[in-house]
Amino acid sequence: MPNSMSMTIWRRLIVTATAVLAAALLTPAAAHGAPHDSRAPRESRPVYSYADAVRESVWVDTGLDGDGDGRTDRVAADIVRPREPALQGRKVPVIMDASPYYSCCGRGNESQTKTYDAAGHVVQMPLFYDNYFVPRGYAFVGVDLAGTDRSDGCVDVGGRFDVQSARAVIDWLNGRARAYTTRTGTTPAKATWTNGRTGMIGKSWDGTIANGVAATGVKGLKTIVPISSISSWYDYYFAQGAPLYDSGPDWLSDYVESDTARARCAAEQRKIVAGAPRTGDWTPFWTERDYVKDASKVRASVFVVHGMQDLNVRTKNFGQWWDALAKNGVQRKIWLSQTGHVDPFDYRRGAWVDTLHRWFDHELLGYDNGVDREPMADVERHPDQWTTSATWPPRGTAATTLRPAPGSASGVGVLGLRPARGTETFTDDPSLSETDWAARIDRSTPEKAGFVTGPLGRDLRIAGSSEVTVTATPTTATAHLSAVLVDLGPDTIRDYGDVDEGITTLADRTCWGASTAGDSSCYKETAAKTKAVDSTVVSRGWADLGDWAGDGKGRPLTPGKAYTITLDLAATDHVVPKGHRLALIVAGTDKDLIDPPSSTPTLTVDLSRTSAKVPLVGGAPAFARATAGSAGGAVGATAAVTASDAASASAPAAAVESASRGVRHEPAVHRLPAR
């Protein structure tokens, strides 16, 4: 992969010149590098001219009338495709990014927007996808979601208007929907140049649309690559009734809507406000925007990418989506980084482009390049240091029940395997955060209850989604709870709390594909931005205690009455190293991550009815071995391991077995992505 501006520009000039000659001389099969014999390359090659690519726009009829003007809405789809295959009678697959951001806000680390020539044809398409893949025999389609940029309709934030915007384009690519050459005209546009095989990709809202479209089961969608994406919009805005932000989806729709849409979509805005009450109650609005429930409809393979410290689209979103896909036997792959809300192009660029290239070649062109037989998971263990797992979560991972016990001082308890009696009391302090709690873990402070193992005698790996059950008695009618798992010990991590969420943007550029005067393939390089820490929060969960009934409805609490609630903690993959300690902290408001309740409660936690289920590689026996001989957490640990616990660690857990269904197992030797 390229590593300097001068080298990549020179290589790009050579490739562009060679592509024109190659397109004229190569047969269609050879042009795509089809593996017709053992000597054939197993990847698509840049043999088509990007400069001569067809650039066109069509408006696809969605069949919906979101803005109520009496006409069905049309969404704009801007297309860049190689010219030569159509002349050779060949049809090409499509890579699609459907986004609300192409005009208002931009895409990528450099916030690129679409630009157009005087005729309305796209000149600059954001991101590198068209520059890199069009010369390799793919078309790239950038879709403006309904109500944004050049599309009709209204933004409904993950609802049927959003999802149908992209699904209708896939239907058109497969001959099942109508499109036109202009926004209001009647001249039809036909997708005769494509075989209909489509892969969707995108970060954040874009990738969320890919999840939503896949959950419809639309034919022709072969793979999706959701990057830092939402699987259930409720879980973007709320955590079991506790608000994660001080605004709702109506603010987001207003932010991205075009001026034209904003003028005619007031009725839709009112529906959004009414459907998403700030109480945090579950409503039909959220049911429509829950893609997890429709995982059984997914036909496409799924390549999930997420930052494990993403506090924008929090990792519960990928965790529950991944588990649902596994349950339904969907072929899948995953990358997990230490970053926040960051695209892999900006933290592992060379390996990402190589892996994505091979993934699309396999899923859309049908090349047997082995990408499906490589390890399922790539995990960033330290900044720029990656490991792989054959399956994810790894075989032998088991939900292990860890239990809190009183310690030598109030609020400074012990974490182990045996149940214990006693209580701990804390008072919500909205001015303090999870990092404040972790820094005070060994001190008796009024805002939290902490439970800690002794220093570990060996590494302990957490992989998957945890949950914490808390029984608490409040002093007020409202209360919010937080539960976090913390690795206590010095480390150097990506600075995910910084404005750039773990990366630093550099001045040098590298080039990924071909360029034109109006669309450069050269992007600023990045480097890991790191921070030395004494502790790392590895998983988090929050809830409104008023949601204790589990039916999606919050209720006023009765002061003095005990309530039991289970908090869903975010999915992660983290190794607590030998010599560090593992902590569970239970507290109230997590500053800047959830809104505080209307009161300031004091809560008394019943330790005998409080526990954490943590997915440990090796299960309870692994925990017992890691804590054996240490103070606190090791007390009685080995004796508390049951026969079923031991069995779960010595053989693949049922949940882990189901997590690998639908995935081809790897051979003894694997080709790892280029670094």
Give names to the regions the model predicted.
Residues H32-A119, P126-Y129, A139, T198, ...:
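Catalytic-loop region of hydrolases
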Residues L311-N317:
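Conserved alpha/beta-hydrolase "acid-adjacent" motif
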Residues L325-V342:
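Catalytic histidine neighborhood in serine/cysteine hydrolases
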Residues V94, V134-V141, K333:
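A fold-wide structural signal in alpha/beta-hydrolase
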Residues M1-A34, A634, T638-A640:
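Secretory targeting and sorting signals
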Residues V298, V304-H306:
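Short beta-strand/loop motif that positions the catalytic acidic residue
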Residues R45, L64, G70-D73, G106-R107, ...:
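Accessory cap/linker subdomain of secreted extracellular hydrolases
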Residues R39-S44, Y347-G636, H665-R675:
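C-terminal, loop-rich substrate-recognition/catalytic regions characterized by aromatic stacking residues
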